[in-house]
């Protein structure tokens, strides 16, 4: 039978490992960290990565139950975020759930580290209503604190319909972000693929 203290030790070991690794990479010159990606990790859960119309393009439907968008930062995630701000590292909120993003903003405000937050590759929620994309209040928050939102060049995240007109939606997304948050907020954020249809 597992001892509950073993779980605590394991959790503490994970936390210590996460913070040690973070400091190691910071000391090697790593400037920022993307806290979440396609699958849950020790820090934060991700949003489901595909719009409903794209489910037919892969085996994503069978994986739907693996994402819980009602989750926020883990305890380890909170400690990592606080340590990042203490070190002065930048934090990329791309792929984080809305609940995790809200908590990151709160921690940033508490530590006076708002300028450390950015989104490297996202869209605008009002252009394509996916929880992956930033809502208007988040875009304004970034604008008020010197942050940027890199526009992803991927139709799945910037277009509400299955289309080949990617450039049109890039333009709409940039225009929307400028109208909501100012011209200093939108940036090029192609992600690793750097493409649109």
What are these regions (language model features)?
Residues 1-187:
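Extended, charged catalytic domains and RNA/DNA-binding interfaces, predominantly
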């Amino acid at each position: 039978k597992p001892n509950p203290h073993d779980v605590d030790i394991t959790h503490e070991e994970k936390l210590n490992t996460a913070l040690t690794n973070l400091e190691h990479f910071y000391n090697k010159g790593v400037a920022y960290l993307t806290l979440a990606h396609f699958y849950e990790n020790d820090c934060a859960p991700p949003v489901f990565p595909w719009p409903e119309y794209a489910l037919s393009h892969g085996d994503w439907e069978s994986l739907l139950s693996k994402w819980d968008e009602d989750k926020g930062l883990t305890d380890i995630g909170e400690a990592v975020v606080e340590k990042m701000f203490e070190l002065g590292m930048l934090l990329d909120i791309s792929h984080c759930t809305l609940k995790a993003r809200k908590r990151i903003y709160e921690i940033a405000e508490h530590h006076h580290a708002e300028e450390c937050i950015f989104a490297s590759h996202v869209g605008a929620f009002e252009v394509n209503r996916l929880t992956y994309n930033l809502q208007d209040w988040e875009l304004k928050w970034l604008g008020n604190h010197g942050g940027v939102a890199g526009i992803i060049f991927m139709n799945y995240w910037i277009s509400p319909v299955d289309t080949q007109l990617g450039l049109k939606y890039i333009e709409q997304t940039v225009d929307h972000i400028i109208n909501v948050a100012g011209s200093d907020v939108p940036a090029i954020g192609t992600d690793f693929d750097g493409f649109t249809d």
